[in-house]
Structures are given as structure tokens and as C-alpha cells.
Amino acid sequence: MKVIFTQDVKGKGKKGEVKDVPVGYANNFLFKKNVAVEATPGNLKQLQQQNKHAEQEREQEIEDAKALKKKLEDIEVEVTAKSGEGGKLFGSVSAKQIAQALQKQHDIKIDKRKMDLPNGIHALGYTNVPVKLDKEVDGTIRVHTVEQ
């Protein structure tokens, strides 16, 4: 019997997958636990529409990420920090501070965890900070660290 999985079932199938399973297993386990439905023409068509809709949403997310990447290339974020001699900072500028400055100065909200800045910025001047905007789209934020 062909079934469409509505949830992941360990060792059997993932959500949205169409598989052949024994009739008894389908009737006594999958249907009773509501983890699968029978693969009727109507259900298959509905699954196809859901997949198409999900694909369109994914394409829109990628387009939005590319637009944000282009916007980030054209701007600069200015962060102030206390520094000593030679342009060395007392402490460092963190991803959280950069995210807050980006929100305040340009009204762009980016999660600090998406910034690839493991040790922070330790010197005055310009720094390019890599940002993971999407699984497929990476960008950079140009950060200008100035003395307070």
C-alpha cells in the first residue's frame, strides 16, 4: 500500500515522502498514530501543491537574502569603543554590538549568531564581518570602529 508520510517515522520515511508499506503496518500503526495518509490521487495532488508552495517560499527567501546582501554592501556600520595607544581597544567589539548598531543606524535586523566573528574586533579602523544571510547566501558588513 502506498502512503504519504505526514511526519518523520524513524527507519521508515520522512515527512512528505511517498512509500510502499505493508497493508497491516499502514492500517495498524501509521494511520492510527496519524503519521501517514493513504496515497490517493487527491492526497498526491495536495502534496504536490504543498511542495510547489514550499519551493516558491524558499525562492522568495533566497531573493530577500540576496537583496539584503546588496544593501549591506552599500552601507557602513560605525561602532564606538574605548581604546588605548596604538589603536588597540579595551576589550573588543562583539557581534551583539554590531547587530545593535546596524539596527539603530540602518534599521536592518540581523541575528548576532549569523555573524562570523569568533573573537570580536580588537582594533580601530575598518573590518569586514562575514554574515550568513541564508544557507546559500553569504554577505559582509563593513564595520568602522572609532574611538569613543
From Swiss-Prot:
UniProt superkingdom: Bacteria
Residue stretches spanning the membrane: none
Gene Ontology annotations for the cellular component aspect, listed alphabetically: ribonucleoprotein complex; ribosome
Pfam families, A to Z: Ribosomal_L9_C, Ribosomal_L9_N
Alphabetical UniProt keywords: Ribonucleoprotein, Ribosomal protein, RNA-binding, rRNA-binding
Described function: Binds to the 23S rRNA.
Name under which the protein is recorded: Large ribosomal subunit protein bL9
Gene of this entry: rplI
